[in-house]
């Protein structure tokens, strides 16, 4: 037996999709405009996971420049068939629905095969039937006319894998389980004991989120819904329950008759979510031809006992800590930037063991790829810390640490120049309006600074360490403006390292020695 702890992927890893290839499991998640896109995780026991890469790791795979933070890549699906891995997803910023493939799930993955106007809508999935034929399953607006916001339907069509093109006729097979349902989305097809099953989300990815299921003996006909639909939801538990918004599930079987579902859910703090939607695991049993999620419990559990042998990895995904160093030739797989990782914005070779971020014109309050590398926030009680060597030579130049929800809502902790002296400046950007919370002198010349942010629930304290001395710079900073409920959108916070010349020309840089996030 092995114990799995929920969430199995902490931090904003929403819209999980899972597949099994032999003894190996793989999960992918939405990434929106973060680059690289679509993180991919591997496990052999469903409890312990390692990140093996990011599927969309080249600019030509991820055209999202100029997008809002919650645009870009929506709801990927991963499937394995006949020795090849397939990932299908939607780029709502450019190109729509597309497929990439790989023989090795760690990459490299192919360039996108765009399906074009023949494949409208979002949240596509692939299904391989017993005869080897592949079918596209997606969502689209009601073709008879959208009567209300979220009036969509689920449809299928054959996909020719040689041409990567939809062929034949499409057919709507389901519109959701509840009368007047909104946003039937995230559909996945399976064939189990002679039935085609369609699992999907409905109710919108918020308080009314849920999982429903339907089935049919034939693929191209209207499906029948489970009498117990929705088969899983947390909406009846109230907004103050520790885990909310549960939905968007994908089934997997372990090869020994045991079934599981991965789904998204959110952990609020004081009624607000900083970490977005995370990946959770639940057991599935079958009764009278229908799945039962979390039998006898009816909600997501903190821990699950799984009937399998434990399998560990040297570098496992942690729910409590991330220690990032810079000795490799490429950025750590956990690090993300906004829109694109531009090679001219950073260097790992000019000073081995240090991440050099150049003070480019682009700033984090604009919708542009800037000199930023961050990791996902994973807890409400934690500290984040970085060590940085920097000397601003112009008043426009700045470097430091950022808690980032989006370009209009973030908290910056920066070293910058005032006359001939360095200053440590804490700036809150809320709905696009910037306000300096505090600024303190920080000496002269090039120095090594350690910046630490200590967060406890929705409050923060900020420390600066230099010349062997520590200073409490700011405290009692509210973090509520950087939550999804206040800032809007579909993402959670990242926190990371940043440098900018704020619209001016500059050849300066900051060298970062480490980045740490630890639960406390």
Kindly give the residue locations of the regions a language model identified.
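Carbohydrate-active catalytic/glycan-binding domains of CAZyme proteins
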Residues: 1-520
